[in-house]
Structure formats: structure tokens, C-alpha cells
């Protein structure tokens, strides 16, 4: 595979062993991502969104095809790809500062202690957590924990920030504040982001492109929607924006109409095949 883009997924497929034989979770996933793009993956539960993210992260290895980042094939986890999960995954016995420091020590071995301290404080400031550097996870809210998790990921200076439903467990107001923070950080850093979400409004608000997945098994990319809304984006202004609502409608149409038709056709085809098989068996 030759690299033409920042991040490339080419003919990616993955099978998982089961007692009844291989289960094909993904098939023929092709995606080209440019440096600095914000990509959202959306689809129904079980469509393979997290599997795609895990393959990019190097946590799963594709059965077919592969992933290339800046000319290098991805086969295992690496610091150039930082992951933020729905669960913040902070170490409970370490302060916010120490949790970020742990990641920085693994990726910034050339920095002096003073430089390392400045870098940790800078990333905590990016997510508006400077006031809580000495707090343990148990002493801060769920939204604050997730902010620290994002700071920890950013402090690794990854080429790609991978986020698996990072705001899914938060209340609506906290989620909105974090979405605004992510937009600010993305504007400041210009980093590449791949995010999984179930939230249509979140996808349209944050993304440059929305990748819509078909339902599994053998899930793949159904459609890719370009979001041509100017940045910076204001959620209140967008609420009455016809183009915003058009994009929102397109995603909902794919998820709740087109997928239903696809499933209906597939079910009808399977029923016809089963019926034909039964006739053949009776004739035999």
C-alpha cells in the first residue's frame, strides 16, 4: 500500500472466531483522512465503529487490508495515536497533574523537568483544568475527569486523536461544554481527530466529514457526508441554520430509512435463498 494521505484505511476487514465459525465484523472499509481533519463515525450499535477505531489504534489487527499513517503501516499501539475512551481511565491514586505526567514521561524523554512541568500545565490549561491539578479523580466531576483524560492524550502530542464516545456518559450541559472545548482545541492545534458518536447533532457540529456505517455483520462504510459549515461554529447560531438542519436530516435519513430498506432487502433475499434451498432439498 502506498501512502497518499495522512491516514489511510484500505480494504480493511476483520473476522472474529466464534464456536460457529468466523464472524465477519467489518468488510471493505476504505477511508482517506487528511491531516487536520475532524472525522466522526456514526451508526447503529454493533456496526463496527469501535472496531474501526481499535484497528486504527493498533488494538486490533485487521484480517484483511490495513492502515497506514504517514507512510507507516499500523500494526500495534503507538504514541502517535492517542485514545480517549468513554471511561476516563484515570489512575485513582494519582492527581490530575500526575495522571498527565505519567503519559508525558513515556513520550517526552528529551524534556527537562521544567519543560515537562510547563507542558503538563499547558495541556491541563487547554481543557480548563488548571484549577484542579492537585485533585484526585474522586474529588472531581465526571466531566472534569474526561477533561483530564483528554489533556493526557493531547500531552502525548499524537498525530491522531482517537475518541470513542468521549462524552456519551455525561449530562447534556457538561457534554456541550466539552464539545465547545474540543472545537477550540482542534482550532488551536489543527490535529487530526477520529471520533465515534451516536449523537447526530454532535457529529454535525464537530465534524468536517461524517462517516456513516452500515449495520453488521459485514459492516462497511455506507455513505460519507461532507460538512461544509464555516468554523468557528456556534451551536446557538447553527440551531436555525438551514444547512445545518439539512446535514442533520441527511444523517437521520441514512440511519433510520436507508438502513431499514437495506435490512429489508437483505432479509427478503435470505428468505428467498432459504426457500430455494428448501425446495432443492425436497426435490433431492
State each model region's role.
Residues 2-6, 15-28:
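A short, flexible loop at the N-terminus of ABC-type nucleotide-binding domains that lies
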Residues 42-44:
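The feature captures the beta-strand-to-loop junction immediately N-terminal to the Walker
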Residues 112-132, 184:
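Conserved ABC ATPase "signature" region
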Residues 136-140, 144:
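Conserved ABC ATPase signature
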Amino acid at each position: 500500500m502506498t501512502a497518499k494521505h495522512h491516514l489511510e484505511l484500505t480494504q480493511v476487514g476483520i473476522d472474529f472466531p466464534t464456536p460457529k465459525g468466523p464472524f465477519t465484523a467489518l468488510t471493505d472499509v476504505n477511508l482517506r483522512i487528511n491531516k487536520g481533519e475532524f472525522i466522526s463515525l456514526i451508526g447503529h450499535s454493533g456496526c463496527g465503529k469501535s472496531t474501526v477505531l481499535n484497528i486504527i489504534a493498533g488494538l486490533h489487527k485487521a484480517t484483511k487490508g490495513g492502515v497506514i499513517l504517514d507512510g507507516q503501516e499500523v500494526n500495534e499501539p503507538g504514541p502517535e495515536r492517542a485514545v480517549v475512551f468513554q471511561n476516563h481511565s484515570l489512575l485513582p491514586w494519582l492527581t490530575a497533574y500526575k495522571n498527565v505526567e505519567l503519559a508525558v514521561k513515556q513520550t517526552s524523554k528529551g524534556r527537562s523537568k521544567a519543560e515537562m512541568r510547563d507542558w503538563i500545565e499547558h495541556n491541563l490549561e487547554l481543557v480548563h483544568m488548571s484549577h484542579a491539578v492537585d485533585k484526585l479523580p474522586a474529588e472531581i466531576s465526571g466531566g472534569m475527569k474526561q477533561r483530564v483524560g483528554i489533556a493526557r492524550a493531547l500531552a502525548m502530542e499524537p498525530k491522531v486523536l482517537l475518541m470513542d464516545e468521549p462524552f456519551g456518559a455525561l449530562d447534556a450541559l457538561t457534554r456541550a461544554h466539552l464539545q465547545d472545548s474540543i472545537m477550540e482545541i482542534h482550532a488551536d492545534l489543527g490535529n487530526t481527530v477520529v471520533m465515534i458518536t451516536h449523537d447526530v447533532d454532535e457529529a454535525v457540529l464537530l465534524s468536517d466529514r461524517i462517516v456513516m456505517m452500515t449495520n453488521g455483520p459485514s459492516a462497511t462504510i455506507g455513505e460519507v457526508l461532507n460538512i461544509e459549515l464555516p468554523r468557528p461554529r456556534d451551536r446557538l447560531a447553527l440551531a436555525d441554520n438551514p444547512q445545518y438542519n439539512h446535514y442533520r436530516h441527511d444523517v437521520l435519513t441514512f440511519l433510520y430509512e436507508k438502513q431499514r430498506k437495506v435490512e429489508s432487502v437483505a432479509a427478503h433475499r435470505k428468505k428467498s435463498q432459504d426457500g430455494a434451498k428448501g425446495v432443492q432439498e425436497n426435490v433431492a
